[in-house]
Amino acid sequence: VANLKCAFGRAEVLHGVHLEVRAGEIVSLIGANGAGKSTTLMCVSRIHRQATGTIELDGRSIVGLAPQEVVRRGLVQVPEGRRIFPRLTVRENLEMGAFTRTDRAGVAEDIDRVCGMFPILRERAGQLGGTLSGGEQQMLAIARALMSRPRLLMMDEPSMGIAPMLVAQIFRTVRDVLRAQGVTVLLVEQNANAALRMSDRAYVLETGNVALSGTGTELLRDERVRAAYLGH
């Protein structure tokens, strides 16, 4: 991503953001509310079409593509607030995640695979998504996104409104299972401490600009980051 700009009406909210996510990495965007983190993800996934700049996936531009074509190229977003289909069962939600695929046998195998990552989903397979707890819905949202076999998975605030124990479980899955499977992750997360600890690299956004970047370890030790986002 290079020189990414986005405006709503006359108000520009991203002022030339540059960031890179290399294959196999976990990269985080941290920053205060309103810094432009979620907007960055929605511009990259082409949900917001007003953005200008360079956006490439595997060296190919995705600017101008419809969101569903971006999914076919291998980029998927887990939205803030989960946004599962409340009136569909867990299994039906997972099947919806594979809407770009035609290989039924492979889809069935992947349902079994993601349920292995989050065993509670197997137990709840016939239950309506809207009846799940917040943590279970977040697991379902991540599993649904994985059903498209993404190369780049973007997650927006996965810890929001979830009990700390479940947050830890979700982060362990992202760190261990997805890394083992070679899925690249771009994470937006208010829990800066947890995000930086699991990230290879991270960017700090402030009012629509990249203010700092470095490895997760470097930013955990940075006095400016510690004072602004880690409570030290």
Where are these regions (language model features)?
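Glycine-rich phosphate-binding loops of nucleotide-dependent enzymes
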Residues: 1-232
